[in-house]
């Protein structure tokens, strides 16, 4: 390969590498609190023209064809249509979030004390400590008042059993359910062909409290001292988010509660996915009326024009290359002829000098003298060549540096139509959309027994069509393939995608931080901003807020196991609640640290190995626990 070929290959490598870099960020400056987004003048559709932190965005023509004609309202109307078939939705609800776990437990205990008809509590972990004993005591008192009382806890989260804790509650006549005892499912799983439907890894991760069918509580809080704030007797180890729902959505939460005890037959899930397919087909049929004008004609025109320009440029380049080649060949022949003449002249000159020297001195040692002179000349030529090679390397490095700087300058060209969006400022169109539409509350659930994957499907749709902002709070993150790609695509097209998770000191279990760290670079390479919580608590919140209009609070972790567990999320389409959750996200972000891409690339070899090891170990454990499970969309194989 020639020098020019090596230089072009190196330059292409720089462009490819820098297209996935997010390192030249505005670290530590006020500009880091801002997100650059582009928009077409006079339209609500976002069309990014620069990348966030040096990330190569989608090609302009592709972005315009896919997203350029969608306004804020069109996007969220489309999202709502896709989410409508996933779970029961209703209006006229009030959703109040709790960021302080002490307030959440105080409100739940007060509701149990004032219950007159029924108290149904479902949790993943119920510990035998002060908070657990107090909760069970209040349930026992409610049952003695004549309320229908039930406590359902998962045996995977309480593997040692809770017989001593719930003994008195059982004696009072209340219903206590131990969900999926581990040893009852451990041996059948291995003896019956390791069918994933029998796997002991399927756990009930839902946290639901329903009081008198009028109040519904949902979120990430288990029952224990670690989950309750200090003002109510706990130690406040976990930073979590819970919510209370009042309105028709409580009955929808009751349906999810009953679904845990008696999962729906597979036919109901099939009917649900038939509805999804039918809705998708109807939507595509309606949208197909404008496909010719909105997509086919612009695409055909672009390809025709682009192809013509490309062909013309290639022909011009080939013609110029041919001319240069002919010139090089002509100069090469001339140099060869000149060299032959010079060599012949030098040879004749040396022979003539030798004859003269021999005739004058009578000595015949002219050959040795000539050879010594040739060696000196060769040594001088070799030194000159080393100097020239060093200069070529210097020029090459300088050219590469200039090309790299030019690459980033092209990416950072600010279009006059671009605007800065402060973190504390809501998305501009969200308020108008919220005023024009009634607040909608939707209860989503996951149940592997009925092949119900509504929550990851909903998050995938929101990530795919989100307009300007997507903020996710999760203890750790190992999203499945489809959701991972949706996050990366959203970030590439200019959406402010942020993930706030625990750090190596605020993640429980601790090894999940290492597994998440393995894919952090993939997310940041696409423009996703990752924050690590550095507060005094362990991050356990599970929330999503999108475009200052849509909020999700529930028990779903963005990891591979939540796809196989029973989960619940309350999704609320309302501008006011979204503003509250955005403020909470910013409060958590203020005590967090953003992961810098350059520092991430320089992490130690031990950290690289640990991240790879735990990520691989979790994937192996997943395949071992759910051996026969296969779904390409829910696969954890994202690399």
From Swiss-Prot:
PROSITE patterns the UniProt entry points to: PLD
SUPFAM superfamilies linked to this entry: Phospholipase D/nuclease (SSF56024)
Subcellular compartments: Mitochondrion inner membrane
Highest taxon above the source species: Eukaryota
Topological type in the membrane: Single-pass membrane protein
Principal location class: mitochondrion
Record domain PLD phosphodiesterase: where: 200-227, 535-562
SMART domains: PLDc
Transit peptide among keywords: yes
Keywords: Lipid biosynthesis, Lipid metabolism, Membrane, Mitochondrion, Mitochondrion inner membrane, Phospholipid biosynthesis, Phospholipid metabolism, Repeat, Transferase, Transit peptide, Transmembrane, Transmembrane helix
Listed transmembrane segments: 510-528
Knocked-out gene: effects: Knockdown of the enzyme leads to reduced cellular cardiolipin levels, fragmented mitochondria and inviability.
GO cellular component terms attached to this protein's record: kinetoplast; mitochondrial inner membrane; mitochondrion
UniProt-listed Pfam families: PLDc, PLDc_2
Reactions performed catalytically: 2 a 1,2-diacyl-sn-glycero-3-phospho-(1'-sn-glycerol) = a cardiolipin + glycerol
Additional facts recorded: Partially functionally complements S.cerevisiae CRD1/cardiolipin synthase (CMP-forming), but conversely is not functionally complemented by S.cerevisiae CRD1.
Entry function: Catalyzes the reversible phosphatidyl group transfer from one phosphatidylglycerol molecule to another to form cardiolipin (CL) (diphosphatidylglycerol) and glycerol. CL is a key phospholipid in mitochondrial membranes and plays important roles in maintaining the functional integrity and dynamics of mitochondria under both optimal and stress conditions.
Family per record: Belongs to the phospholipase D family. Cardiolipin synthase subfamily.
The protein, known as: Cardiolipin synthetase
